[in-house]
Every structure is written in C-alpha cells, then in structure tokens.
From Swiss-Prot:
Top-level lineage group: Viruses
Region (Dimerization/Multimerization of capsid protein p24): 279-365
Short motif Nuclear localization signal, span: 26-32
Region: Interaction with membrane phosphatidylinositol 4,5-bisphosphate and RNA, residue numbers: 14-33
The organism of origin for this protein: Human immunodeficiency virus type 2 subtype A (isolate D194)
Keyword line: AIDS, Capsid protein, Host cell membrane, Host cytoplasm, Host endosome, Host membrane, Host nucleus, Host-virus interaction, Lipoprotein, Membrane, Metal-binding, Myristate, Phosphoprotein, Repeat, RNA-binding, Viral budding, Viral budding via the host ESCRT complexes, Viral nucleoprotein, Viral release from host cell, Virion, Zinc, Zinc-finger
Sample GO molecular function, one term: zinc ion binding
Stretch list, region Interaction with host AP3D1: 12-19
Protein name: Gag polyprotein
Interaction with host CALM1, as annotated region: 8-43
Length: 521
C-alpha cells in the first residue's frame, strides 16, 4: 500500500485532488483512483512502478491506446486516469479529464511523428462524407469490397427485437440497421434472432412467396455468352444460391444494375409488418380513452396503434381526424368540441392538458359542493303564497313560540282548562284517522244515525239465496260424516246393540255397512 501511495507525493497529490472527473462536474480525483489504477495494471501485465514517472505513463498509454476503441468501461477509465497522472508528472495544469486526454494525445503524436490521432472515447464522431462508414459495401481503389457487419450492429438488432417484441418500432429499426446491406448481411441479422421462431417462419414464407412472384415476372432469357453475369433469380435475391461477390456485382454493375439488397429488404419488411399485426392484435377502433387517463397518454396509444396499421395514408388521415376525438372520454370530448372544426394536435393537447387530472377533479367536486350548499331560489309567486308564521303561545303572527316573549300558556291548548293536555282533551272529536292537525277538525267524522221512518231503496233479498245456503249446509254435514273414522262407527254399533241411541248419522253409516257385508256380519 505504501508503494502505491508513493506514486504521487506532496504537491502532485494536492494537484490531483483539483482535477475534476468530468467537465464542470462536482466529483474530483482522489488517491483511491490511483490505487485502483495500480490494481488494474496487473491485469495487463504492467508494473505498478510505471505510474511513478512520466516515461512510465507514456509506456502505459502506448500499450492501452490500440485497445481503447473496442475496450470495456474499466479499460477506458484506466486510460483516462493514466492520462491525468501523466499530466501531473509533466507539470501540466489541467482542470478535468478531457483536457488531460488532449494533452497526452498531442504529446504521443509529436513523439511518434505521425498525424494519427487517438480515438475519442467519450465523443464518437460520424464518418466523413463520401466514405462508407458502417456500410457493408465500400469502395477501395475503384473496386467494391464487402465488409462484414460489426457485432455492435447485430447486437443492436437483437436487442431491438427482444425489447420491442415485434412492435411497430421494429420495421423502421430494421430499415435503419440494414441500410446498404447485401442479402448475405440481412440473412446474418435474421439468423441472430434466437427467440420468436414463429415470426421468423412467417418471414420465410413471405420470402418464398415473393421469390416465386419474382421468378414469374422475370423469366430466364436464352443462353448467355461465356463470362457474362446472369440475371438474379428469386433464390439469388434471398441469398441462398448466390455468393457475396455476385450480389455486389448485381448491385453495382453498369449498365442495368439490380439492387438485390433493397429488394430483399422490401420482402422482409412485408414479413415484419405481418408479424407486427400478429403480435399487436389491438385494433385502432378499440383504442379508447379511459375515464381517468390523461389525453396525452391516450394520444400516444392511439398513434402507436395507428403506426401498426398497414393502410393507405388517406385512411390514416381520416382515422386521425375522426377517431381521435370520437374515442376520447366525455370530459375531453366536451373540450375538443369547443375548438371548432379540424383542430390541430397541438391545440387539442393544450386544451386537454388539465382534463382528467387531480386539479380538474377537485374543481368539479368544489363546484358540485357549492351547488349543493347554495339554497334553491324561491319563485316570487310561491313566496307570496307562503303563509306567515303564527305563534301558538300568544296567537300572533310574525314570530314562533321559541321567540315569543309572552308568558307560557298553561293548561290545555284546546279548551284552556287545566288538569289535562291537548292530546287528552275531551272536547276534541276524532275519527278512525286520529285527531285533526293543529287543532282543526278531524279529516273524517262518525257517520250520523239515519232518521226514523226512512225506507231503504235496496231491493229485497232473493229467496234463491236462502235455498243455496241450505244446500251448502247439507253438503258440509255429509262431508263431515264421510270423514268420520272407523272407530266411531263401531262405537255407534255397540250403542245400538245395548239399546242406546247413537249420535245423529250413525244409522246411515250402519246401513252402508249392511249393504257391504250383509246381515250376518
């Protein structure tokens, strides 16, 4: 530990703590960063003592420089730390890591005598105009050469498929990553997809269908002269029966070039669009705003579904103008209708910015509470018809009994006598509905007795009614006799043998038994 601390001593250690990790940042370098750099040097087979001098730091930078473009984050951090330590040994005052890297870069260029510059780690730049950059086919010395796709491009494509799972973003992402690719490179991208093999099979079927259509539209011409390049077939465009050199020659031959890469990309885009519809079954007609959903979130979902729809631009424009307002919730729809005909999206987002949020809900609740607490206005005619308040204690109008200053009336309020209350007053007259309200007469009165000598106007009773009642009584008696138990009948028979008189109806029961069993029974 002591040897590692001896890398920077005294003034150099103080200067190290003044250097910022990032431009305009708050964090600064500490001795722990030097200790970490010494530990990392062991991984590269470099001695820790190299950090103690300016020449040693230069040797470290020469070793690390070729590894920086493709190195890990730890390697880049080690390179930055060594640059700062080199500046401290060279007594160069720097404010942050970026300045230290620039100074170290200038020194290495001057020492090697070349005009090459170290790659900028934190700020990657775009390739100069006129050069291929990341394109698989590049021109060198008048000839077209093939450069394989970088692992970074393939990794970006695989991450796009895994994260979006064939969402609407996959199609434009594939277009951007496969720009300028040959069928060989595009097949590499498709082969890197491990999951979602069902979607890959759909894409293969689309490729086979498009290749068959290409062969039908471009028949094979007659025999070609020796050495002449043949025209591509559907399988050649798909990259199964053609080589990379043939694909490049078809793409850049003069005259009559055939862009096999763009044709193959178009076929795969058709397959990807079908996969997008399969993995996103939500129809744009079903995208509706929830009662508590913000209008901005609803617009995002609407345009995401609209992006997955593979329809004509005119149809998409109609969907935007019609369905966007039609499927909004009632609160936003009320606001949008007040904007007039064909409002812009910016106007709609601005108008519905607070609709559906907590502030709008609180405002509506406050208005509803205010309306509930506000008394309803009484019409003038109804106010004129309302009777004045009358005091039941003194009988005057204009105040109630609670506000009356007169002495409280004693005794019964009905008759004025003491010893009972109005509820028990004998002078009150009540019907079956009780006493009348507020000392008034009851709502019904006992029926008065009819005066003597009046002749009823109802017709006399019909004699057939009496005859019907008589028949009903006889039938009732017969049913009772039939329902008598056998025990009672035998008791009546014993009474007859003993000379006693049985109850009524017993003789008839015995006659029935004689008719069944005869006289000997």
């Amino acid at each position: 530990m002591g040897a590692r601390n001896s890398v920077l001593r005294g003034k150099k250690a103080d200067e190290l703590e003044k250097v910022r990790l990032r431009p305009n940042g708050k964090k600064r370098y500490r001795l722990k960063h030097v200790v970490w750099a010494a530990n990392e040097l062991d991984r590269f087979g470099l001695a820790e003592s190299l950090l103690e001098s300016k020449e040693g730091c230069q040797k470290i930078l020469k070793v690390l420089e070729p590894l920086v473009p493709t190195g890990s984050e730890n390697l880049k951090s080690l390179f930055n730390t060594v640059c700062v330590i080199w500046c401290l040994h060279a007594e160069e005052k720097v404010k942050d890591t970026e300045e230290a890297k620039k100074l170290a870069q200038r020194h290495l260029v001057a020492e090697t005598g070349t005009a090459e510059k170290m790659p900028n780690i934190s700020r990657p730049t775009a390739p100069p105009s006129g050069k291929g950059g990341n394109f698989p086919v590049q021109q060198a010395g008048g000839n077209y050469i093939h450069v394989p796709l970088s692992p970074r491009t393939l990794n970006a494509w695989v991450k796009l498929v895994e994260e979006k799972k064939f969402g609407a973003e996959v199609v434009p992402g594939f277009q951007a990553l496969s720009e300028g690719c040959t069928p060989y490179d595009i097949n590499q991208m498709l082969n890197c997809v491990g999951d979602h093999q069902a979607a890959m099979q759909i894409i293969r079927e689309i490729i086979n269908e498009e290749a068959a259509d290409w062969d039908a539209q471009h028949p094979i011409p007659g025999p070609l002269p020796a050495g002449q390049l043949r025209d591509p077939r559907g399988s050649d465009i798909a990259g199964t029966t053609s080589t990379v050199d043939e694909q490049i020659q078809w793409m850049y031959r003069q005259p009559n070039p055939v862009p096999v890469g763009n044709i193959y990309r178009r076929w795969i885009q058709i397959g990807l669009q079908k996969c997008v519809r399969m993995y996103n079954p939500t129809n744009i007609l079903d995208v509706k705003q929830g009662p508590k959903e913000s209008f901005q979130s609803y617009v995002d979902r609407f345009y995401k579904s609209l992006r997955a729809e593979q329809t004509d631009p005119a149809v998409k424009n109609w969907m935007t103008q019609t369905l966007l307002i039609q499927n909004a919730n009632p609160d936003c729809k009320l606001v949008l209708k007040g904007l007039g005909m064909n409002p812009t999206l910016e106007e709609m987002l601005t108008a519905c910015q607070g609709v559906g949020g907590p502030s709008q809900k609180a405002r509506l609740m406050a208005e509803a509470l205010k309306e509930a607490l506000t008394p309803a206005p009484i019409p003038f005619a109804a106010a004129q018809q309302r009777r004045a308040i009358r005091c039941w204690n003194c009988g005057k109008e204009g105040h109630s009994a609670k506000q009356c200053r007169a002495p409280r009336r004693q005794g019964c309020w009905k008759c004025g006598k003491s010893g009972h209350i109005m509820a028990n007053c004998p002078e009150r007259q009540a019907g079956f509905l009780g006493m009348g309200p507020r000392g008034k007469q009851p709502r019904n009165f006992p029926a008065a007795q009819a005066p003597q000598g009046l002749i009823p106007t109802a017709p006399p009773i019909d004699p057939a009614v009496d005859l019907l009642e008589k028949y009903m009584q006889q039938g009732r008696k017969q049913r009772e006799q039939r329902e008598r138990p056998y025990k009672e009948v035998t008791e009546d028979l014993l009474h007859l043998e003993q000379g006693e008189t049985p109850h009524r109806g017993a003789t008839e029961d015995l006659l029935h038994l004689n008719s069944l069993f005869g006289k000997d029974q």
